[in-house]
Amino acid sequence: MWLGEAIANWTGLTTEGVRQDAPFYTDDDWGLDQNLDWKMDDVIDFVLQDPWLSDDDTDIEYVYLYLMDQHHTALLSSEQIAAGWREHINDWIWVSNRRARDLMELGALPPVTGMGTLNPDYLQIDAQLTTELFGAIAPGMPDAALRLANLPILTTAGGYAAHAAQFYVLLYALASEVDSTQPRREQIVWLVNQARQYIPDTSKTADIADFVLTDYLANPDVNDWERTRDAVYERYHQHASDYGFIYQDWTESSVNFASGLIALLYGEGDFRRTVQIGSLTGWDSDNGTATMGGLLGLLYGYDQLAAAFPDAVLSDRYQSHRTRPTMPDYLPEDSSAEDTFTLMAERILPLVEQTILQAGGIVDGDVWTLPAAASSQPLTLNPLFQLYQQSVNNQILQAGGTLEVNVVGEVAASRTRGIADGLEHNFSGQERTRRLPQAYQRLVTDGELVVSVVYDRTVRVHTIRLIEGSVGGTAIRAEGLMGDDWQPLTDGTVISTSPDPAVPYQVFDIVLPEPVELSGIRVHIESSGRLPEVSVLELDAFFDGAF
């Protein structure tokens, strides 16, 4: 996996960001000397290194591996992720990764760091190139893979960008389930179809996957991958608004997700061809290429990868200190590398076995028996879709209903529109056409801020979620609207975390001892300190049942 990812990453870097718009590359450009002073390798050709240099397509996953190894768990917490980023991920990061890291510097934790209100780059590519590893740690267990990858994905992504990252995680998790007796073309199509089942039909990511796969299957010429790339350019970039979409820029999730799928499908399991196509598709061309190179390495193994380069000796060494100088040196006697892919694989194996055991499987020496596959529909196993389906704000809005937001003492209703817009829990994956709201902020001079959301129907609520930030520290009291009366929700309720004035935004889950029928929720947020300012991103509830 790591070797395939590294070859594809550095080959793709020869073209990264060069063609951000038409005219794009074609097969005829392979071997072209671009004469670009700002590229380490400006000839479009396979790049082989010794040692392999770290880059953001491998080094954030590399840090995650270190954190999992150190904490002896593949299920990292918000605190573990943020601490690891602050210690090891400081430079060589861009777009959403940079935004998330800056928020962490202020004390914010995932998933807040990937929420659109605070991170306007949440629909960029970042999570797609930093989380595939979690799929490899859960072979044949896509539901477990999604659970492990959930917080790492939400660290930098939301909406359909989070779905694209999930899709890649699923490809890696499902690689072990491919029928090796089938032709490679059929194996790849099967993988894409299986991963697609976990993504909601409403998502832009689903639209892209369906569009690319359909065009590939309808194309009589497997070498004419440019046809599909150009169709992607037309639909999601050049005339995106004609199709109800928005093109962000060359580092966005969407066109680069499409490029990765084009390389995977038209490459038909051939490593060299897959990397060639990925490198020539355009936009941020190293990212999806690296993902698919790693996938084929995982799927077909080292011997097949080595056979693709019969005249080369493929290095096993990895120089992590190029971009991550605070990481451990596992090769103190090697002056130019700090790790090897072999050692990295050895650190992954215990995590794989732990994941299998925790999922109910069996580990007997070198034999792994995976747990029985979940009988549920794949989409229902997606933790992001589960969150969206249980969000009262989102489901009422999706059903065409109404929500009434009130902040005591606030006369400008436009300032409160983001409090119950559902953005922080909206994982339908639909294109967002409205401008992102700002967090509601208020200097609380009378001791407390009172915020309510009233529904147009009664809902069976089991949890109230407040995403809030306060300079001076807070105390929170919750109430529910029962009939015409607001009733306190105190007996037996548990708040998931304690207010911390050092954390700019926190997620508070107020868990009720049992579900309660409510037609509204209200919170009293008490703030203290020299500057008692309170910020509110979202006030939502999670429900049992269906609308």
Description of each model-found segment:
Residues 13-48, 58-61, 82:
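Active-site-surrounding "flap" and adjacent substrate/cofactor-binding loops of secreted or lumenal enzymes
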Residues 105-106, 110-122, 131-141, 150-155, ...:
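Accessory "access/gating" subregions that flank catalytic or transport cores
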Residues 390-430:
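Predominantly extracellular/luminal regions of secreted and cell-surface proteins
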Residues 206, 214-240, 245-246, 299-393:
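Acidic, carboxylate-rich catalytic segments that either coordinate divalent cations
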Residues 70-125:
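Extracytoplasmic mature domains of secreted/periplasmic and thylakoid-lumen proteins
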Residues 7, 11, 18, 22-29, ...:
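Catalytic phosphate/nucleotide-handling subdomain of diverse soluble enzymes
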Residues 488-499:
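Solvent-exposed serine/threonine-rich low-complexity stretches and specific carbohydrate-binding patches
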